[in-house]
Amino acid sequence: KLYADGTADKPIVFTANSTTPTSGYWGGIIINGKAPISGSNANKSDTGLTEIDNNYKYGGNVDNDNSGSLTYVKICYAGARSTADIEHNGLTLNGVGNGTKIENIYILESADDAVEFFGGTVNVTNLLAVNPDDDMFDFTQGYSGKLKNCYGVWESDYTSTEADLR
């Protein structure tokens, strides 16, 4: 479980240790839960999820899984690559349940997706994604939670986006 609970006046900031940070400077936040996912939670290699290490299991049958709380959190310049094929998101929620609290989140310039949901039932309220290099929000493995007041913005001078052929 991860508990990172800031306030509107004092948010918790996860960012690069640099005076000139860029997207992909560090890995990002990854939370593994026990909520339902589609497909096998024993072997995710058949889902094309090369960014997930099969040694770290997630998913199960606990809809209300509590994987902690993120409130008033800023995630900046995440999305580093582990290898040429393994890239990370600003926030990755793997089989996270609706007993987890995710509210008032700001994700700035992630080198991959701002946030990706791999199944799970977690609800997210008040999320702003700015200038990710890939998707604002990505969903796979049967995500079935709810998003409320979640927005994404690409600033007009930001040119590092990638397009998926879908």
Describe the role of every protein-language-model region:
Residues 1-166:
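Beta-strand/loop edge motif enriched in small/polar residues
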